[in-house]
Design a protein with these regions (language model features):
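Bacterial N-terminal signal peptides that target proteins for export
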Residues: 1-9
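Serine endopeptidase catalytic core focused on the charge-relay Asp
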Residues: 106
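Acidic, polar ligand-binding/catalytic clefts
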Residues: 75-101
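Short, conserved active-site loops that position catalytic residues or coordinate cofactors/metal ions
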Residues: 71, 102-103
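Exported/periplasmic ABC-transporter solute-binding proteins
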Residues: 22-53, 62, 66-67, 72, ...
Length: 269
């Protein structure tokens, strides 16, 4: 009888997600937030206050959204607003909330051979890279950063796919790998500021262009819709979301710094 019951328990564990057995929350999020140390900072604070453990899967925004659409998530934190809104409109998420922001920066070799540092806009900077034909390294992974980069090329009226494999090279990888390749090739790239600040292998790279309003980088948070994903851990993930949006959570986000530099700025709604 005991053996039979053990088999039944194993079958149930196999069929149903682990989140319904405990307090773990499965968070699909970006490499930029995890690699910056953000979650290593805030999640222990949240767990200490609530007893709830949050497990993070860090991938590009596009992949994170696909994973959540496949019910492999309880909550989503990414940075591609139009895709986030579509996620909710298509019934996969309950509601999108602004959570925090920072910005993107254009990096390149310190001597700046494409002369982008005096540009008046991000699009002008990209046009200079295009004009000189200097190497630009793209993530090429459908991440939030990649989506922003493609949007900037479009605004600059450059059909970037025409130059793929020439001076425009795609890594198909995360920001860390892309930065390493950019540093090795002494090329240009677009990065979120948080990853750049925490990146160790800077070599001769530096920020050459920043501050354009089009480089704004908004992060959103969305609970997965239990009507689409009935086994989602809605109870604990809602506690986590409410904490992130609360005064306490927002102050915790604001306090996270690396080498005295604030990486994310809370702006919950």
């Amino acid at each position: 009888m005991k053996t039979f019951l053990n088999k039944i328990i194993l079958i149930i564990i196999f069929i149903f997600p682990s989140s319904i057995w405990g307090k773990d929350v499965l968070l699909q999020s970006t490499t930029s937030t995890k690699n910056s140390g953000f979650y290593s900072y805030i999640l222990p604070i949240f767990k200490n206050e609530t007893g709830i453990n949050v497990k993070v899967v860090a991938v590009g925004t596009g992949q994170a959204i696909r994973n959540a659409e496949n019910c492999d998530a309880d909550i989503l934190i990414v940075h591609a607003k139009s895709d986030e809104e579509a996620f909710v409109e298509n019934g996969h998420g309950i509601k999108r909330h602004n959570l925090m922001y920072n910005d993107f920066v254009i990096l390149g070799p310190s001597e700046d051979p494409a002369e982008i540092s005096n540009s008046q806009s991000a699009e002008e900077a990209l046009n200079s890279i295009f004009k000189f034909g200097y190497s630009f390294i793209s993530r090429g992974d459908n991440s939030g950063t990649h989506k922003k980069e493609k949007n900037l090329w479009e605004n600059a009226q450059i059909e970037i796919s025409d130059y793929s494999g020439k001076w425009y090279k795609e890594t198909g990888s995360g920001m860390g790998t892309t930065l390493n390749i950019t540093a090795e090739l002494n090329a240009y790239t677009l990065s979120d500021r948080a990853t750049w600040i925490t990146f160790k292998n800077k070599k001769d790279l530096k920020i050459l262009y920043e501050g354009d309003k089009n480089l704004f980088n908004q992060y959103g948070a969305i609970l997965v819709n239990p009507e689409r994903c009935p086994y989602t851990n809605l109870k604990e993930s809602k506690i986590f979301l409410n904490w992130l949006l609360s005064k306490n959570g927002q102050e915790t986000i604001q306090k996270y710094k690396v080498n005295g530099i604030q990486l994310f700025y809370p702006n919950a709604n």
